[in-house]
């Protein structure tokens, strides 16, 4: 359906019997009305044609083959000159066979039936509206007991009792024995009520606005009483207040949507289109049918039996009629939600029947599998791995996925560059994986963003845009800083990749969805691209080192890891001479040559033109030389000054990890400054 804001939407709700008839009924040229399914049959075992008025009837649901009726006659579809549109012999309409995907039928129930979703699901809407315990309502629906009708003026058999106690169930064994079907119906219609018809009467008599006013008044009275001092009573009062709030909200919803509460009790049962519950012929001539068909057959069998008891047989005891009504109620319950009342119904092979609820709910249901989470074109899926060398707005796309996603774009590129004369030649070159194919693929990918999505998509950052680049392997490479927005990590998580095709979608991806434009949380405004997990561990490993500073002297075994520089003094003490480097390039070169470790302490000559934070600490020691120069020794660095107190050089005590970390930060700051200068 389409609402007033032109949004396409699907709305599930209660429907009136008149609307069900409108969906299903058709009037034939001879005046006959079709739409009601009265027979529990599917196909004739000899002709393999649908049975008339059965679950696959062509008169009700449309022809199996487009434009061909059950007699075999053919009419051109959509030709207004050819008349009539219905076959005069079989009554089948000459329309497209796709009508069997949406044309519905209905079953006219011999007795009202309560919709089990609104009775047994929690919270029970029927119990909330009637303000009665669910257990008592179940006993009423399944004919375990009854209640008296309030007759004001006329004398009654039950001696004017305004209600029938639920505990008194002796009527179940005594009253029906004194009446035939006709007599018992007269008595029941006048004085007592049971089954779903009793629920329907009570729902029809409800005044929703009065329910809201009374519930609000009771809620205020409970609020004014305050705590009783008894924990049990306080909990009971709290549960009652919560129930009153739910009851008022439910009544307001019925008023707002203009839906009558008695619609929760069914008089007509809709029959799904046959294409949604097919019967398929498999190898060996065997037939495979949907479980929905068998459940519909069960309902029709029991409903027809009840109809016969009420119309044809005049000597059947009333108790048998009520038992048959209970069987009809249970059959409809099994069709709608098998197993909701306890043990599920099974077939001859001890397999549980798949009811209507099982078809639509869950991960493999109709909505999530074929409507919301269905597979779409121009999409792929793979495991994500970390790409530490990637930019924040880039992602690594495996060649196998990229060539499949951009298949049509590569074909167009091959034809435009006159490398292939037609689509067939272009496809053959792609299958052969010619080198020119990868070059064109890279050109196409440079101007086309992709969308990465990780389920479940709980907020806006669950799907972001990236600039793809080709990588080897079969996993999608991702920058670790964007993982928090996806709530992802690299322990086997999978992501879906989609290609925005239209110009509007590409513009939206570039302007709003790129990862480097979503650095803040849209909910609270805090930074969301922050180091987590692997990055924190990597930063810790990079910056770990000798925390004791220069106080760790040569006799301290803390520095034992520089095995190449170990020395033994006269007292047989092992100590390490810390290496000295004139530049960071020399230190990194020594690390690559495995002369030092990542966290090994070393001395590094610091350039005076580099940024230096002025120290506020007092030197640990000052060493003076004969030429007037002196050394100020601090915890992690050493300053050499001349006679005029001018800094001659600075030596810092650091590690290779800290040097690498500093270089990365310095490059990032320089890149940010260049970007700011370009923008101004």
Curated annotation (Swiss-Prot):
<dbReference type="InterPro" id="IPR034678">
    <property type="entry name" value="RNApol_RpoC1"/>
</dbReference>
<dbReference type="Pfam" id="PF04997">
    <property type="entry name" value="RNA_pol_Rpb1_1"/>
</dbReference>
<feature type="binding site">
    <location>
        <position position="87"/>
    </location>
    <ligand>
        <name>Zn(2+)</name>
    </ligand>
</feature>
<protein>
    <recommendedName>
        <fullName>DNA-directed RNA polymerase subunit beta'</fullName>
        <ecNumber>2.7.7.6</ecNumber>
    </recommendedName>
</protein>
<keyword id="KW-0862">Zinc</keyword>
<dbReference type="InterPro" id="IPR042102">
    <property type="entry name" value="RNA_pol_Rpb1_3_sf"/>
</dbReference>
<dbReference type="InterPro" id="IPR007080">
    <property type="entry name" value="RNA_pol_Rpb1_1"/>
</dbReference>
<dbReference type="GO" id="GO:0003899">
    <property type="term" value="F:DNA-directed RNA polymerase activity"/>
</dbReference>
<feature type="binding site">
    <location>
        <position position="69"/>
    </location>
    <ligand>
        <name>Zn(2+)</name>
    </ligand>
</feature>
<dbReference type="InterPro" id="IPR045867">
    <property type="entry name" value="DNA-dir_RpoC_beta_prime"/>
</dbReference>
<keyword id="KW-0804">Transcription</keyword>
<dbReference type="GO" id="GO:0000287">
    <property type="term" value="F:magnesium ion binding"/>
</dbReference>
<keyword id="KW-0479">Metal-binding</keyword>
<feature type="binding site">
    <location>
        <position position="493"/>
    </location>
    <ligand>
        <name>Mg(2+)</name>
    </ligand>
</feature>
<feature type="binding site">
    <location>
        <position position="90"/>
    </location>
    <ligand>
        <name>Zn(2+)</name>
    </ligand>
</feature>
<dbReference type="InterPro" id="IPR006592">
    <property type="entry name" value="RNA_pol_N"/>
</dbReference>
<keyword id="KW-0460">Magnesium</keyword>
<dbReference type="GO" id="GO:0000428">
    <property type="term" value="C:DNA-directed RNA polymerase complex"/>
</dbReference>
<comment type="subunit">
    <text>In plastids the minimal PEP RNA polymerase catalytic core is composed of four subunits: alpha, beta, beta', and beta''. When a (nuclear-encoded) sigma factor is associated with the core the holoenzyme is formed, which can initiate transcription.</text>
</comment>
<comment type="function">
    <text>DNA-dependent RNA polymerase catalyzes the transcription of DNA into RNA using the four ribonucleoside triphosphates as substrates.</text>
</comment>
<comment type="similarity">
    <text>Belongs to the RNA polymerase beta' chain family. RpoC1 subfamily.</text>
</comment>
<keyword id="KW-0150">Chloroplast</keyword>
<dbReference type="Pfam" id="PF00623">
    <property type="entry name" value="RNA_pol_Rpb1_2"/>
</dbReference>
<feature type="binding site">
    <location>
        <position position="489"/>
    </location>
    <ligand>
        <name>Mg(2+)</name>
    </ligand>
</feature>
<dbReference type="GO" id="GO:0006351">
    <property type="term" value="P:DNA-templated transcription"/>
</dbReference>
<dbReference type="InterPro" id="IPR044893">
    <property type="entry name" value="RNA_pol_Rpb1_clamp_domain"/>
</dbReference>
<keyword id="KW-0934">Plastid</keyword>
<keyword id="KW-0548">Nucleotidyltransferase</keyword>
<dbReference type="GO" id="GO:0009507">
    <property type="term" value="C:chloroplast"/>
</dbReference>
<keyword id="KW-0240">DNA-directed RNA polymerase</keyword>
<dbReference type="InterPro" id="IPR000722">
    <property type="entry name" value="RNA_pol_asu"/>
</dbReference>
<keyword id="KW-0808">Transferase</keyword>
<dbReference type="GO" id="GO:0003677">
    <property type="term" value="F:DNA binding"/>
</dbReference>
<feature type="binding site">
    <location>
        <position position="491"/>
    </location>
    <ligand>
        <name>Mg(2+)</name>
    </ligand>
</feature>
<dbReference type="GO" id="GO:0008270">
    <property type="term" value="F:zinc ion binding"/>
</dbReference>
<feature type="binding site">
    <location>
        <position position="71"/>
    </location>
    <ligand>
        <name>Zn(2+)</name>
    </ligand>
</feature>
<dbReference type="GO" id="GO:0005739">
    <property type="term" value="C:mitochondrion"/>
</dbReference>
